Amino acid sequence: MKKTYLLNSEISEVVARLGHTDLLVIADSGLPIPDGVKRIDIALTKGIPSFKDTLNTVLTELGVEKAYIAKEMIDKNNDLYLYLLELFGEKLIIISHEDLKAMSKNARAIIRTGEYKPYANIILESGVEF
């Protein structure tokens, strides 16, 4: 059995296959998932698993160079915005929700959580650990 925090085999495989600048999306329960992008649906019910729990677990194994969020989060989900700003600092890039949806078409996978708060979506750009 794995010793690290990330136990979901599908997510672990995607993270292991990411190369430098590849994209991984962690999404709330409402973000549209484009055709052709791998869907990893871990939503069980409203709020479970949460966006934060999923993100924090993925970050135990993924080095992030940049993180993209929708500017709408600043007003509509400010607590999450402040949390992400503290977590990522200058790596956090603000774009429109429409641009985030367009960018998600290039993701290696989208992890759909049970998060039920607005604009709880992030695109993680894989970095290098050397």
From Swiss-Prot:
Keyword Phosphoprotein applies: no
GO molecular function: D-ribose pyranase activity; intramolecular lyase activity; monosaccharide binding
One Pfam family per UniProt: RbsD_FucU
Database matches in Gene3D superfamilies: RbsD-like domain (3.40.1650.10)
Catalytic residues identified in the record: H20 (proton donor)
Single GO BP term: D-ribose catabolic process
Associated pathway: Carbohydrate metabolism; D-ribose degradation; D-ribose 5-phosphate from beta-D-ribopyranose: step 1/2
Catalyzed reactions per annotation: beta-D-ribopyranose = beta-D-ribofuranose
Subcellular location: Cytoplasm
EC class (word): isomerase
GO CC, alphabetical: cytosol
Main location: cytoplasm
Binding positions (substrate): D28, H97, Y119, A120, N121
Enzyme nomenclature, EC number: 5.4.99.62
Domain of life the protein comes from: Bacteria
Family: Belongs to the RbsD / FucU family. RbsD subfamily.
Role: Catalyzes the interconversion of beta-pyran and beta-furan forms of D-ribose.
NCBIfam families: PRK11797.1 (NF008761)
Assembly, per entry: Homodecamer.
Protein name: D-ribose pyranase
Species whose genome carries this gene: Thermoanaerobacter pseudethanolicus (strain ATCC 33223 / 39E)
Gene: rbsD
